[in-house]
Structure formats: structure tokens, C-alpha cells
Curated annotation (Swiss-Prot):
Core subunit of the mitochondrial membrane respiratory chain NADH dehydrogenase (Complex I) which catalyzes electron transfer from NADH through the respiratory chain, using ubiquinone as an electron acceptor. Part of the enzyme membrane arm which is embedded in the lipid bilayer and involved in proton translocation. It catalyses: a ubiquinone + NADH + 5 H(+)(in) = a ubiquinol + NAD(+) + 4 H(+)(out). This is NADH-ubiquinone oxidoreductase chain 4L. It is a multi-pass membrane protein. InterPro entries: NADH_UbQ_OxRdtase_chain4L/K (IPR001133), NUOK/Mnh_C1-like (IPR039428). The chain crosses the membrane at residues 1-21, 29-49, 58-78. GO terms for cellular component: mitochondrial inner membrane; respiratory chain complex I. Keywords: Electron transport, Membrane, Mitochondrion, Mitochondrion inner membrane, NAD, Respiratory chain, Translocase, Transmembrane, Transmembrane helix, Transport, Ubiquinone.
Amino acid sequence: MPLIYMNIMLAFTISLLGMLVYRSHLMSSLLCLEGMMLSLFIMATLMTLNTHSLLANIVPITMLVFAACEAAVGLALLVSISNTYGLDYVHNLNLLQC
């Protein structure tokens, strides 16, 4: 296995561990989630470049679109929680129910 793939998998694993360890604050959870999506995007792009498949070119772009949507929804939720409660704790998420 080439060294670049091992580095990307290590970045994904570190982001996953950060997501599990720092899950009390929403901002740190969003940053770890973005790190995971970035490493998955780079891995999908490298796999697409190595396979030389024209049909697989849409996969990294689709992942990038979903990552942007996830970031927008996460930041909107962060602003809503911060304006309402003044804190960004994840345990406040269940208080936003109608």
C-alpha cells in the first residue's frame, strides 16, 4: 500500500477519534466531521485517478456537494444554538424540538 493512502487513512482515523473524544462541543464535532469528509474526498479522488474511469469522476464531486451541505446545516444549527442558549454543547440539540 502506498504511503499516501496510509497517510489519508491515518487522517481519517485521527478525525474519527477526535469526533469520539471531543463530542461535547458542536464546533469541535463539526471540525472533526469536516476532516473526515476531506480525507474521504481525497481518497475518492485518488482512487478515481488511479482507475482512469470516466464514470467514477462524479463520486468525488458528489461527496464534495454533500460535505458542503453538511457544513451549511451544521453551522446553521451552531448559530441557532449559540443564539438561543449561549453555548455550543451537543446535549442542547434535543432542546430544539418543536
